[in-house]
Amino acid sequence: MAAAAAASSMAKRKQRKAATEQEVENHDEATVAAEAGPENDGHTAHAAEEAAAAEEGVEREGGGEGGAEGEEGPDAAARGGEEGKEEEEREVSFDELGLDEQLKRALRKKGLDKATPIQREAIPLILEGKDVVAKAKTGSGKTFAYLLPMLHELLKLSAEGRIRKSAPNVFILVPTRELCQQVHNEASSLLEFCTSKLKVVQVNASMSDKDIKVALSGPPNILVTTPACVASCISKGIIRGSSIKESLSMMILDEADLLLSYRCEDDIKALVPHIPRSCQSILMSATSSADIEKLTKLLLHNPFILTLTEVGHAKDDLIPKNVQQFWISCDAKDKMLYILVLLKLELIQKKVLIFVNSIDSAFKLRLFLEKFGIRSSVLNAELPQNSRLHIIQAFNARLFDYLIATDDNKSKEERQANKGNKKDSRVSRKQLQQTLDAEFGVVRGIDFKNVFTVVNYDMPPDPAGYVHRVGRTGRANKTGASISLVSPKENGIFEDIENMLKDVENRDTSCISPFPLLTKNAVESLRYRAQDVARSVTTRDIKEARRQDIKNEILNSEKLKAHFDENPRDLDLLKHDKLLSNKEIPAHLRDVPEYLIDPTTKEASNVVKLSRAAMDIDKPRRRKRMGFKGGSGRSSDPLKTFSAEGKSRRRGRKERDGEQDRRKRKKVES
């Protein structure tokens, strides 16, 4: 009831505002609303609602149920116009959205009070049981936009004793294992503060059938997985189709536009016959595409479409305004030189996420930076799942500041060309037998914490890839920056990106500016050193580094599986930025002599350092935060002290014993 009241109140405010601004265009807007579907009877009210939603920043399209609810006359709208404008500018708290008290308590514990625009719009609609397609930029809060109403409904059913037990009640389908882990962690963190015992599990293709059966025993209320894994479970009889029809009440597709590009179309189609007609479906995406339209027609019934276009009154379509975009023109052979100058002369803020298009490029860059004393780690599809997750956690915990991530996704045209080539399809089957993980994905969905700078060492294959890469910084309204190194061969894709951003933001000038802190003198001062070191990194060195890194991470993965389930805070026991090369690093390469740094570059570097100090970025980390208490630990080890008591308790006991001895001595003396 509370959710319905909140949704109704919001709709009325929008309609009051819209009526004053759309009197002249009511006929045209009504025609647009009439074309949305034959079930829309309240054309004028629906048009007003669409106009109001667009003014606020969320474009809403819907079927029959979204029509003429709560229509008011022009006089009432005129009286409430200014009031509605003030109300819409006011932030909405989670308390106003009608969520369960347990969830509100969990949000308060996490320090969350205000809903983001996509949460403000999507949560009431999902609570009303409507199918929803929500499109919003990365970092806008889409995960909680579906987790909160989903958990609210399950908590309500659990309290009423109406949960069906034959199969999971909710499927959350995501394209990658990393995102699967992230969504599972977010849902679990909310349920920690709930008294109702709801169970959420994740399964993936790397698990054995036995482990999957154990995980699905019960069964759980919420299953987070990939389409390929759930389709495999159905085909093997681990999950029965009849049980899904009986129990499934909600299905959520996160990063929906990426699901089909990850070869999940057949898996999703195999799942469709088992989905009950009454199942509520939700699609979350950062972009619009033909794939979204295909999934919408396949799974949803008369959905509401929410497109987040603005936050307040500042246009903020694809790239947040708090993210500065820069580019540097350079030859492909000079890219390592430019990266060296940016990092060694400290012209960009840490933490830095560097994107490359191949694994060999990633290791070549890592070996190159090692020669200059710059430690980094590589995140790629060859690594074991546990190691990939641990690298992300360690990077988020600032155990190292530079992460090189491989983004192997090809453009849509290349995928279609390869799909029609039989020879290529045979090669892809061989590749599937190798160690590359088809469900690996680092660009989409993964929540990197406090990344300040994203560097496109290699340009992405398409504009959408650029948007998703840059979306790894500037999350949760924090400032960020992106720097793209553009070679002459990449000018075409760079122009496509610029044109897309111009069209979206309706600008004549470029949205991406030349990087202002880099001077020609700074680049030339390190050119000869960089060229000598780059030549020393051979193909053989790269292959050996890849082999050594995989060997190290396999050992790490086995340790991780046994240890970190019980000790999740001990993140720095394993180092992912160890030196890969066995060759001794020349001492003169670690530091840049003062005479090589020109005054302009030195001043720019000082500005970056002062900015970093003002943001408290370089505050020293305490070992205690990572699960270490310092000291030898002898006093608290019962095997070494023959005492199960801690140091403070024994100290108190000694003081009490000493006081008793003094009293005895006084009695004897008297």
Curated annotation (Swiss-Prot):
Stretches assigned to the Helicase C-terminal domain: 340-523
Positions of disulphide bridges: none
Keyword Metal-binding tagged: no
GO cellular component terms, semicolon-separated: nucleolus
Biased composition annotated in UniProt, kind: Low complexity: 1-10
Domain Helicase ATP-binding: 123-306
Keyword presence, Plastid: no
Short sequence motif Q motif: positions: 92-120
Single GO MF descriptor: mRNA binding
EC number: 3.6.4.13
InterPro entries to which the protein is assigned, alphabetical: DEAD/DEAH_box_helicase_dom, DEAD_box_RNA_helicase, Helicase_ATP-bd, Helicase_C-like, P-loop_NTPase, RNA_helicase_DEAD_Q_motif
Binding of ATP, residues: A136, K137, T138, G139, S140, G141, K142, T143
Residue ranges of the region described as Disordered: 1-97, 616-670
Keywords attached to this entry: ATP-binding, Helicase, Hydrolase, Nucleotide-binding, RNA-binding
SMART domains (alphabetical): DEXDc, HELICc
Record field: compositional bias (Basic and acidic residues): 18-30, 40-49, 654-670
Motif mapping: DEAD box: 254-257
Family: Belongs to the DEAD box helicase family. DDX56/DBP9 subfamily.
Protein name: DEAD-box ATP-dependent RNA helicase 16
Organism: Oryza sativa subsp. japonica (Rice)
